[in-house]
Amino acid sequence: PFAVFYPPIEHSMTTTLYRPVGPQELKLIKESGWTAFPPRLPDQPIFYPVTNEPYAIQIARDWNVPASGSGFVTRFEVETEYLKRFPVETVGAREHMELWVPAEELEEFNRHIVGKIEVTRSFPE
């Protein structure tokens, strides 16, 4: 369903990223005051925000809903300079681009989020 290439959207100081989440992760984000993602579980060594909303929608709708009954797309801004340390990985089709943040660096990553994490879509609709 994707026809165009979606690199991260860079603004002068921040880059827009997306993260598909299930209801439990969304609850923890809300408990943070919409400012941080929760620590990864022991079997989750990588935190992987994605670079475009269509890919986040696909994951939330096609993976999170079957796994947990609902899925949500979050959008947030991160300091562009900080993000340069993380490679953008293409997993599958060329629009399936993710940043791979080691779980042990997530707390630091959260400190570089600018503003609030917001929900842009929810599934089922």
Language-model-detected regions and their locations in the chain:
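Conserved NAD+-utilizing ADP-ribose enzyme module
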Residues: 10-47, 53-125
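Short, Lys/Arg-enriched N-terminal segments with co-localized hydrophobic residues
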Residues: 1-12
